[in-house]
Amino acid sequence: LPMHQLTVQQAREQFDQSSALMDPGLDEPLPRVETLFVPARDGTPLPARLYSPQGLSASPRLPGVLYLHGGGYVVGSLDSHDALCASLAERAGCVVLSLAYRLAPEWRFPTAAEDAEDAWCWLAAEAAR
């Protein structure tokens, strides 16, 4: 069925499953992946994954990327773009923070945008440490 004919939950499941088909296939080494929580301005802990390239672990500072998955603010997840974030971190030699921002329709605008801004501020503060 087309996505617009599915329930929100069905659309999210279909999106995650179809995203697995776009796995870029990363050769070893795989990046280090840390699951963490980024604090939102309202105190909500937002799930996130931090991908760090294996080969550059001795480098004192690496470029950082805040990765916000696609999906029109309704579908998409940390899992739907996991392989892409891993590939980006390893191939570009950067740290990638992938954020599980809050999705519509459960969360109204501008929640997702605020979550993204909060994650950006968190990433910048962590980089300065």
Which residues does each PLM region occupy?
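Serine-hydrolase catalytic-loop signature spanning alpha/beta hydrolases and amidase-signature enzymes
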Residues: 67, 72-75, 80, 96, ...
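Short beta-to-alpha linker loops that shape the active-site pocket of alpha/beta-hydrolase fold enzymes
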Residues: 54, 95, 100-104
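Short strand->helix junction
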Residues: 73-74, 102-106
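A glycine/proline-hinged amphipathic helix-loop "lid/cap" segment
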Residues: 1-46, 50
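Short beta-strand element of the alpha/beta-hydrolase
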Residues: 48, 60-72
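Glycine-rich phosphate-binding loop signature in dinucleotide/nucleotide-binding domains
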Residues: 57-60, 129
